[in-house]
Amino acid sequence: MDIRQMNRTHLDHWRGLRKQLWPGHPDDAHLADGEEILQADHLASFIAMADGVAIGFADASIRHDYVNGCDSSPVVFLEGIFVLPSFRQRGVAKQLIAAVQRWGTNKGCREMASDTSPENTISQKVHQALGFEETERVIFYRKRC
């Protein structure tokens, strides 16, 4: 298995994996996200490849605003991670996280953060298994003006 930072040749593989994680996200929106990741210095995606097949990805960003539970800035933020079901429990996600962490460290980050919804217990377990610690639970509100 090989972990690579996404480049243009990986876009179709990445989009296929991403559609499995976020199936409600329109295809053209995935493409626009991919183009933005390729062009922006504060965004990156890493692809796990095995025998020429994309088996997982991790999207990340560098955030300079307040990140819940963090004490420093900037923070490398895990925006999303996905591994094909047949490749789970084999250390793929761990290697993807290590690549994201190295990228963030090279960008001056001392902390990595992520989030998930309170009802997504599978994601919570994955985060804990990958070394993340829960920092807080937040409910957001809005009021239209």
UniProtKB/Swiss-Prot annotation:
Instruction: Give the UniProt keywords, A-Z.
Output: Acyltransferase, Antibiotic resistance, Transferase
Q: What residues form the membrane-spanning segments?
A: none
Q: Does the keyword Transferase apply?
A: yes
Which terms in the Gene Ontology molecular function aspect does this entry carry? aminoglycoside 6'-N-acetyltransferase activity
Location of the N-acetyltransferase domain: 1-145
Q: What class of enzyme is it?
A: transferase
Record-linked InterPro entries: Acyl_CoA_acyltransferase (IPR016181), Aminoglycoside_N6-AcTrfrase (IPR024170), Bact_Acetyltransf (IPR050832), GNAT_dom (IPR000182)
What this protein catalyses is: kanamycin B + acetyl-CoA = N(6')-acetylkanamycin B + CoA + H(+)
- Which Pfam families does this one have? Acetyltransf_1
Whether Transferase counts among this entry's keywords is yes
Taxonomy, superkingdom: Bacteria
- Residues holding acetyl-CoA: 81-83, 89-94, 120
Tell me its EC number(s), please: 2.3.1.82
What are the binding positions for substrate in this chain? 22, 25, 66, 79, 115, 136
- From the UniProt record, give one GO term of the biological process aspect: response to antibiotic
What is the documented function of this protein?
A: Catalyzes the transfer of an acetyl group from acetyl-CoA to the 6'-amino group of aminoglycoside molecules conferring resistance to antibiotics containing the purpurosamine ring.
Oligomeric state and partners? Homodimer.
Q: What is the protein's given name?
A: Aminoglycoside N(6')-acetyltransferase type 1
